[in-house]
Amino acid sequence: MQYNFKVESFEGPLDLLLHLIHRYEIDIYNIPVAEITEQYLSYIHTMKELQLDVASEYLVMAATLLQIKSKMLLPKQEEDVHDSGEDFIDDPRQELMERLIEYKKYKQVAAELKEREQERAQLYTRPPIDFTSFQQEEAANLPLDVTLYDMLAAFQKMMRRKKSKRPVTARITRQEIPIEQRMTDILQKLETLGGRQSFYDLFADEEREVMVVTFLAILELMKHQQIVIEQEQNFDEIFLSCANHNSK
């Protein structure tokens, strides 16, 4: 069975690269191209495996990374001497680095504008009340924002776990389950368990095809805001909860 699924929340290859740089605490001014290329291609492979609609710009960036990687492997040659008299070594990463820095600035400005818009929406004609202490305490306890890239990383990790635990002689039974049915199953399971469950526990004892459908169902539930995804810190376990429970 084919599951064609388009994820509109992906913002593009630069967004994915920034996610990887943040996730693995990479210096944006000194990008380890081999490492970042491997991680990037791994995400693309997972997206294709899940039959997500991967835009051509992702593939163009993959080709760009591979080209930069190959240039980095070549012996470095001294280029023309600048007016200052200093030798200049051309860095194949320079253009990509500049694009990432500019995109990061754009994202920061966009986030600030959104925050100001939200603050503006909370203004009333009544005298102002100082909520500073409450807001600081609340912010300290807020979980991280979980992106679709975080979900892909969690799915990759889970698939590796399953592969390492699966017996060599295991036979996969093909099961065809509609995504809509799996969405209903997940919501019912969350309700039964008090509205919250670990991401990995949802995939217990499932075969590969069912795992794929389960993951796509989770993405659909996220898109329709029927579930909330939480993660306390980077690389921590991800938890799912029903949106109606979370709002209570």
Swiss-Prot record:
Pfam families: SMC_ScpA. Keywords: Cell cycle, Cell division, Chromosome partition, Cytoplasm. Its main location: cytoplasm. It is found in: Cytoplasm. It comes from the Bacteria. GO terms for biological process: cell division; chromosome segregation; DNA replication. GO terms for cellular component: cytoplasm. InterPro entries: ScpA, ScpA-like_C. HAMAP family: ScpA. Belongs to the ScpA family. Participates in chromosomal partition during cell division. May act via the formation of a condensin-like complex containing Smc and ScpB that pull DNA away from mid-cell into both cell halves. PANTHER family: SEGREGATION AND CONDENSATION PROTEIN A. Component of a cohesin-like complex composed of ScpA, ScpB and the Smc homodimer, in which ScpA and ScpB bind to the head domain of Smc. The presence of the three proteins is required for the association of the complex with DNA. This is Segregation and condensation protein A. It comes from Bacillus cytotoxicus (strain DSM 22905 / CIP 110041 / 391-98 / NVH 391-98).
